[in-house]
Amino acid sequence: MRKIFLSLCLAFCVVLSGCADEGNSKSTVQLLFPNPDSGIWKYIGQLCAQLMREANYEVELHHCTNAAEQVEQLKAAVEKNPAAIVIGAQDANALGEPLTLAKEKNIPVIAYDRLIMHTDAISYYASFENNSVGEFQARYVEEKLGLKNGAGPFTIEFIAGSPDDTNAPLFFNGAFNYLKPYIDKGQLVVPSGQKDFQSVATDGWKPDNAQRRMTEILQKYYADGKSLNVVVAANDDLAEALIRAQESVGYKGTPTILTGQDAGANGIANIKAGKQSMTIYKDPEILCGKIVRMVKAVVEGSQPAINDVTNIRNDVKTIPSYLCIPIIVDSTNVDIVKDFR
């Protein structure tokens, strides 16, 4: 598998170098991304900027610590009248006003990974199959527990992402809807009773919020050695919150099947240590490469390659999109993940 992966990476780099050699005129692209303290977002920003420069674009890279700061960054970016703007939204519901200004100036806007809501100013969207993320987590649980063979009952809890991230409900719904038949049959049991997105969401994706909630659940429903068999955590940070919560209460049940996402440094370390079962790898090189090719197309006045023209809607319009396929990573293939610490 590793040889195949490396071969694909080499082929991908050749494609990108070919794009760079085609010689775009020097045009400025504004890149706006969340949280500079996040290892993955810091890496994504640096990678996208590098690939844009290799494709002969000038780049201005911005990270924000909150939604208000990103709004101001976007307003400033629009004033500079760039060739294109790429946005990984801090808050997908907060960018409507400055995006209206971008549309008035005919500036192409591409949403990176997080769909920006309530605006008709988004030109294109590039992400991964986010419903598939949750479904892949659920399929992993199904296989490990032998649910197809009627095994159970097993206890399960959910830790979802932030309500202001449009991907978070997709992750949760993908997992929950796949596992719901097993919940209905009694093969999976949710002792806390928390089975809807709002009940299991984690404000700001903050691990401390998830840890507090899971500590309460463990103390109330899993005391005296009762086992928590499965936790579907939306990403690696939230998975680590469960690990810390179990350590803080002295959890004595059987090991928990624990999902994650992002293949971050903490997730990979926890998989190697046997504390986390799996993660979902959304390879930043694949998505950043797609973004570069989208920018190149719109700047040159052509149509970017897209693979979904019907399913991605932000409450105002259907957004032409390209959706990549994520990869399940566990202890058997953990070495395919690039180190972006």
PLM-predicted stretches and their roles:
Residues 19-341:
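A residue-level marker of the well-folded mature domains of exported/periplasmic proteins
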Residues 6-7, 117:
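Short amphipathic alpha-helical "recognition" segments used for binding
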Residues 7-15:
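Bacterial N-terminal signal peptides
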Residues 1-4:
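Positively charged n-region of N-terminal signal peptides that target proteins for export
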